Amino acid sequence: MNKETNKLPVYNETTKKYNVSVYADDQRTDENNVDVYIAAPFTLASREQEIVIGGAWNKSELKKNNFGGSYYTGGNVLNVDALNFNDMNTQIVVPIEKNQKGVLNNTVQTAGYISGKFHILDPLKAVAGVRVSNWEYEAVDGKGNREFKNEITPYFGLIYDVARDYSAYVSYTSIFKPQNRKDVSGNYLDPIDGKSYEMGLKGEYLDGKLNAALSIFRIEQDNVAEQLYDSNGKEVKVKDSNGADTPENAYFAAEGVTSKGVELNIDGELNENWGLSFGVANFDAKDAKGVDYNSTSSRTTADLFVKYKNEAWYAGAGLNYFSKIYKGTGATRVDRGDLYLANAMLGYKFDPNFSTQLNVNNLFDKKYYDGIGSDSMIWGEPRNATLSFHYKF
């Protein structure tokens, strides 16, 4: 993954002016994965069973180059009233030169696991497993180095065939997830620890051409990072060794964060010409004090996509819905209202092996914020199109 950053510093409260110096960097994340396992099917009580034993290794390495800094023609500050981002002289006075820095940090994860699929009775199946994980983070400057060993995360599930076309299931999964958020003193928060429960019903219709699933879930977690605000609703920053603010937001470990919700999905073919994909989900998340958690995620989302095909041609259109989100508290609270986005698709199949397809996202070029913060906003993607060709060998 590659990422390039260009930054303009924010408004200076002391001078009442904007600093228009410029800074640039780029970074890349390299990932390597290895997963080796052995599957051993066997028969017990005249029913097929399976045991899987394996191990996994993952290394994620962050590399970064700094290009240094400069400032724009006209000085390094401008009066706030005179600043016009649409008419700026963007000539850089001092060339920005690349400063190779190399690897900043790496994260290594190793795990061993064993799992099984068991056919207990004709209508009843079970899945179960356990994973033992090791996690290590190492930075070049030695800051934040930490390691967790022999973390055990089991899971278990039951599937029961209620009728020929219906099955019900329940599942349990334990959660262990290291995180990179820091408290106000600059210490990394402990890993997220928790449990996940889910139950649902799945059905098949029209000879298996149309599938539907309804599920409810509950997730209980501790040590979940929650952003820290002062009594005025202003973001609290991580302090350096001298007690001064850094640019990094501070977090605290919220206990008893509970998320619960419901999901409904329908997908498949209605007949030889029409296809349908529909999904709706709703969840609520609060900490032990009853305060909303993850308020920048829509509590309700829905998507509908209808597809029509006639011989070689096929076309589709859809609508996505995202409920309102917010960030912050009090006077610094920022809201984004409900959001609707339309998409469309058109394709042509030249023969059984060769086809082409045009996808258009955000069909009506809706202007919206995809991410919100107390002092920053992220624009959502404008209307965009992708033309692809597919060939099967």
Language model feature labels by segment:
Residues 1-55, 59, 211:
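Outer-membrane beta-barrel domain signature, strongest for Gram-negative TonB-dependent receptors
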Residues 1-8, 168, 193-269, 276, ...:
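Membrane-embedded beta-barrel scaffold of Gram-negative outer-membrane proteins
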Residues 2-11, 18-19, 57-77, 138-142, ...:
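Outer-membrane beta-barrel and related beta-rich outer-membrane complex signature
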Residues 11-18, 65-101, 226-251:
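Surface-exposed loop/turn segments flanking beta-strands in extracellular/periplasmic regions
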Residues 29-31, 48-60, 101-221, 269-271, ...:
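Structural signature of Gram-negative outer-membrane beta-barrels, strongest in the C-terminal barrel
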Residues 122-123, 251-330, 345, 349-355, ...:
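Gram-negative outer-membrane beta-barrel transporters
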Residues 200, 379-393:
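Outer-membrane beta-barrel "beta-signal"
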